[in-house]
């Protein structure tokens, strides 16, 4: 059993899957700045060069000869409270920045030279070829983040783990909403196995681009079945479910079922997992097919009020996307 990479259901707010983009930057001569948002871990290709020099899997600026420092501004796809920060300098050994700082702001418009940025991490040492991790204890939400490196160099990845804070007043109580959406605040709390693919893609927008763009378990050689637990972005009444096996052909699950629960009190992830086998069944065990979108209407007689759901697949395999649709209940 795994609890979402020890992040307790937090999402990477800097992920392109969230809609995060680079708004502006000072320089990316050696390595395109967008590379540092890549969800995949950085790689090193020894003999790969381009017109600017050694190809590096990350953002890398040229050597500064004029003083000052380099920077990049991220526009987060969803505003959120940042709890954990990872500045990954993997494979940057003689060319990593010795210091960095991080600032944030919440603004309905793009920041400018007069914007009042809040310091998240003051100027701090970085270690080369390393995942540099930091924790924050802030309650403010941000939708723009500025990474500054001193004076120049390369950053393989930036990851900002936190909780989406969406303005649910934008929806009325009769609208059908994708309650599981990553961008709205849906998150993966735990799963028993995720050997292949990208588990966070399960709640992402659009259809999977490849077989690697989804949740896939290893081949099960023992009795039982695989499962994953998801916290919905908002408590709601579930009315429709979509299970998409795009690109999974010889390795899609034979069957699937879904259970749900509505929890109003604080509960540990461990207790949640232990109780999940006894949650209400809202989708009985049903056959799946390869490379296909499966849609299910939830019977109004079912107990479909939920804050969390558990997807069971039998016995194993891959699911590209899971979408839970319904009407919101309590506003956050």
Q: PLM features: residue spans?
A:
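Trp- and acidic/polar-enriched beta-sheet ligand-binding modules for extracellular glycan
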Residues: 1-71, 91-227, 236-237, 247-332
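Short, well-ordered alpha-helical microsegments
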Residues: 83-84, 155
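Structured core elements
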Residues: 229-231, 242, 310
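Active-site-proximal cofactor/substrate-binding loop regions of enzyme domains
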Residues: 80
């Amino acid at each position: 059993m795994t609890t979402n990479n020890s992040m307790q259901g937090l999402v990477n707010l800097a992920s392109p899957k969230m809609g995060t983009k680079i708004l502006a930057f000072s320089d990316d001569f050696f390595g395109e700045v967008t590379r540092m948002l890549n969800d995949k871990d950085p790689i090193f290709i020894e003999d790969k060069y381009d017109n600017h020099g050694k190809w590096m899997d990350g953002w890398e600026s040229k050597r500064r000869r004029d003083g000052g420092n380099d920077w990049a501004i991220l526009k987060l796809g969803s505003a959120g409270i940042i709890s954990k920060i990872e500045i990954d300098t993997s494979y940057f050994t003689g060319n990593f920045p010795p210091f960095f700082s991080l600032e944030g702001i919440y603004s309905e418009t793009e920041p400018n030279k007069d914007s009042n940025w809040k310091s998240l991490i003051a100027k701090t040492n970085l270690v080369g070829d390393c995942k540099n991790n930091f924790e924050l204890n802030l309650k403010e939400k941000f939708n723009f983040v500025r990474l500054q490196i001193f004076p120049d160099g390369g950053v393989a990845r930036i990851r900002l783990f936190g909780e989406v804070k969406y303005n649910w007043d934008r929806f009325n109580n009769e609208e059908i909403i994708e309650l599981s959406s990553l961008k709205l605040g849906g998150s993966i709390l735990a799963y028993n196995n995720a050997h292949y693919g990208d588990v966070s893609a399960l709640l992402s927008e659009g259809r999977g681009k490849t077989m690697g763009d989804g949740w896939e378990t290893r081949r099960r050689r023992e009795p039982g079945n695989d499962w994953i637990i998801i916290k919905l972005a908002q408590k709601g009444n579930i009315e429709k479910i979509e299970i998409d096996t795009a690109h999974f052909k010889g390795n899609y699950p034979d069957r699937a079922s879904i259970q749900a629960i509505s929890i109003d009190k604080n509960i540990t992830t461990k207790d949640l997992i232990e109780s999940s086998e006894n949650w209400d069944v809202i989708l009985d065990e049903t056959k799946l097919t390869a490379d296909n979108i499966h849609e299910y209407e939830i019977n109004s007689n079912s107990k479909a009020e939920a804050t969390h759901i558990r997807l069971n697949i039998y016995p194993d395999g891959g699911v590209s996307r899971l979408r839970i649709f319904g009407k919101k209940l309590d506003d956050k």
